[in-house]
């Protein structure tokens, strides 16, 4: 979706603020993209980008209050933007599309976050994070199990785990005594839908509390069936990760940030990308966490917390409007999003056509998975954090071994949460 409008007008200068600066991994990609857009359109960018920290957040809010905001802004789409959204200082995607129908038309609107201030979508996202299930396909092949897909159900997943166990392998690489976070999150999500996953229970026996208890009961069930490593209660996450990469375990539930760890594990020198054993890496894949109940398998935990805004100031300036639109379209094209996001979350409708020599096979598989995602929902544990989680996170070994009653553990966490409010 690239606008022709900008090339027709007289060259203009637009001011842009992003967080692609300092140590940000995309700082150079951003500089290169700005230079290419300037070259293509004849326009120029006055770049005000800075490292994402509290200083930048304060500066942006102050800029809006004093009328010195940028024309285009790459910023958080959550509560940090509430002040300038509520003040009407940015233009919604729908309003921009009334004049430029192709604006962000390469994006799946279901994956674009609405502002919490008014439930309207303003920011066009680039990259974010996802949590999903990595697979060692060598183990699946040895056990005669098919690769799980977008249609795999929870019961089918349990059957697969049993076959893997019967073949002498560990079905699930997880250290429940160290990092139970991902299983806690998804097993609770499996009792819910994207619409209610971020609810915090008022008590262990209300609707949400019951869902949490049932989710933890599923983890206990997996433990009792012997689908976790024998040492899952005492092992470290690093140890169970090694069992996965060494071909002893089939499934690993983790985040998009784990792709790099799997890739470097397939290098003879973890620091040197040129030593990658591509045949070894080809044994790894990534897919959706099997769904249960009303959660579709393709509903992922993840998020796109930032995006490009066009300010009202730029929109109302006849000289700058088309250039601002052109800039955002350029920075959010399929090609550019693939470069910035790589294997992380995006809102692209289609898996981008990428130069596969620039990406490894696991990154390409992750991009393909993303194109089938039906929703991204944040992790409820990020809202229910700190000491609230001790009874069910640190307490997971006692929960799965039946030494602690699940409802009591959930209630203890809720009591801690309520006391902190």
Per-region residue spans from a language model:
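Periplasmic-binding protein-like
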Residues: 169, 223, 328-350
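Conserved N-terminal structural module of periplasmic/extracytoplasmic solute-binding proteins
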Residues: 1-87, 98, 147, 270, ...
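Short, solvent-exposed loop/beta-turn-alpha elements that line the ligand-binding surface or hinge
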Residues: 94-107, 150, 192-214, 267, ...
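Glycine-centered hinge/linker elements that transmit conformational signals in sensory
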Residues: 159-163, 201-233
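Conserved C-terminal helix/tail region of periplasmic/extracytoplasmic solute-binding proteins
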Residues: 141, 337-338, 346-357, 368-421
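Hinge/lid segment of periplasmic solute-binding proteins
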Residues: 8-10, 76-132, 158, 183-190, ...
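A structural signal for short loop-to-beta-strand junctions that line the ligand-binding cleft
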Residues: 63, 70-71, 102-140, 170-171, ...
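Extracytoplasmic/periplasmic substrate-binding proteins
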Residues: 19, 33, 217-319
């Amino acid at each position: 979706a690239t606008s022709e409008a900008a090339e027709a007008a007289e060259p203009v200068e637009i001011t842009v603020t992003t967080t692609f600066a300092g140590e940000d991994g995309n700082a150079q990609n951003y500089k290169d993209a700005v230079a290419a857009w300037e070259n293509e359109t004849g326009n120029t960018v006055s770049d005000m980008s800075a490292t994402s920290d509290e200083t930048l957040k304060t500066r942006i809010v102050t800029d809006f209050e004093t009328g010195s905001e940028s024309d285009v802004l790459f910023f958080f789409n959550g509560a940090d933007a509430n002040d300038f959204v509520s003040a009407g200082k940015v233009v919604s995607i729908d309003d921009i599309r009334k004049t430029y129908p192709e604006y962000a038309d390469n994006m799946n609107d279901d994956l674009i976050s609405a502002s919490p201030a008014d439930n309207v979508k303003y920011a066009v996202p680039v990259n974010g994070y996802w949590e999903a299930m990595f697979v060692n396909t060598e183990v699946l092949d040895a056990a005669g199990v098919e690769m799980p897909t977008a249609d795999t159900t929870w019961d089918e997943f349990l059957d697969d785990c049993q076959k893997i166990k019967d073949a002498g392998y560990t079905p699930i690489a997880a250290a429940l005594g160290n990092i139970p976070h991902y299983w806690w999150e998804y097993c609770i999500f499996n009792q819910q839908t994207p619409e209610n996953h971020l609810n915090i229970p008022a008590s262990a026996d209300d609707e949400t509390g019951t869902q949490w208890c049932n989710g933890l009961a599923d983890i206990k069930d997996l433990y009792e069936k012997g689908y976790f490593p024998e040492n899952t209660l005492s092992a470290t996450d690093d140890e169970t990760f090694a069992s996965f990469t060494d071909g002893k375990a089939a499934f690993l539930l983790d985040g998009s940030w784990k792709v790099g760890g799997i890739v470097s594990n397939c290098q003879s020198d973890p620091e040197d990308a040129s030593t990658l054993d591509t045949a070894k890496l080809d044994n790894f894949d990534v897919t959706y966490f099997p769904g249960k109940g009303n959660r579709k398998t393709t509903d992922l935990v993840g998020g796109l917390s930032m995006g490009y805004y066009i300010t009202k100031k730029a929109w109302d300036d006849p000289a700058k409007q088309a250039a601002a639109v052109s800039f955002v379209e350029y920075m959010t094209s399929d090609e550019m999003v693939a470069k910035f996001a790589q294997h992380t979350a995006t809102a692209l409708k289609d898996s981008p056509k990428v130069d596969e020599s620039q990406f490894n096979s696991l990154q390409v598989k992750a991009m393909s998975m993303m194109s089938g995602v039906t929703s991204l929902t944040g992790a409820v544990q990020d809202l229910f954090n700190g000491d609230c989680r001790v009874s069910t996170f640190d307490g997971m070994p006692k929960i799965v071994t039946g030494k602690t009653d699940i409802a009591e553990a959930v209630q203890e966490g809720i009591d801690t949460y309520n006391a902190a409010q």
